[in-house]
Amino acid sequence: MINVLVFPCGSEIGLEVHNALKYDKHINLVGLSSVSSHGRVVYKNYIEGISFITSDTFMEELNKIIEDNNIDVLIPAYDDVILYLSEHRDELKCKLATSNKTTCDIARSKRKTYEVLQGEWYIPEAFKVSQITEKDLPLFAKPDIGQGSQGIMRIEKMEDLNLLKGKDDEYIISELLPGQEYTVDCFT
């Protein structure tokens, strides 16, 4: 039996991991959350109340939970947690099911992802605020670090750019890609 800890278990990723692994007779799933979440309803084994990753005591608390529950593998289930744990992998008292720190860092930043994939046909053209002219519109702006469509903005006219002046480092401004958006999450 493999003891697998999912944190945070109430995130969309955490719930998907549960759905993917809940019937595997070789896996004992344990859900962990800092706050009360839907994970409480879904996970048979649920632990609540660990500090946030920004706390100085987080790693100590996490390792105690890992040891107390004989955890073999930790699956991080939120973007910031994935990056944080990849940076602290050597401190963990169990295996971590995620990519290396460099890959996690690139994946967390849209700008870094665009830089790595620059020149590929499927990457939209990106702009700096100072380079944009009327003929470039409409455009699309999104935070470099973010998820769930939070902070996105469609730029229809030059005046819309006033909100983004001085924020070239915080936002990615790209050509607007029309049509349906599809998101694919996969855990196998």
Predicted regions and their residues:
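Flexible, glycine-rich phosphate/dinucleotide-binding loops
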Residues: I13, H38, T103, Q147, ...
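A conserved helix-loop-beta module that forms one wall/lid of the active-site cleft
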Residues: E87-M153
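Short acidic-hydrophobic, aromatic-tinged amphipathic segments that line or gate anion-handling sites
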Residues: I47-T54, A126-S130, M153-E156
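ATP-binding N-terminal substructure of ATP-dependent carboxylate-amine bond-forming enzymes
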Residues: M1-N100
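Hydrophobic anchor at the start of a short beta-strand
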Residues: L29-V30, I123-P124, Y171
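Short beta->alpha connector loops
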Residues: C9-I13, D79-D80, V129, M158, ...
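Flexible loop residues that form catalytic
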Residues: F52, D79, Q131, D144, ...
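Phosphate-binding site of ATP-dependent enzymes
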Residues: R154-T188
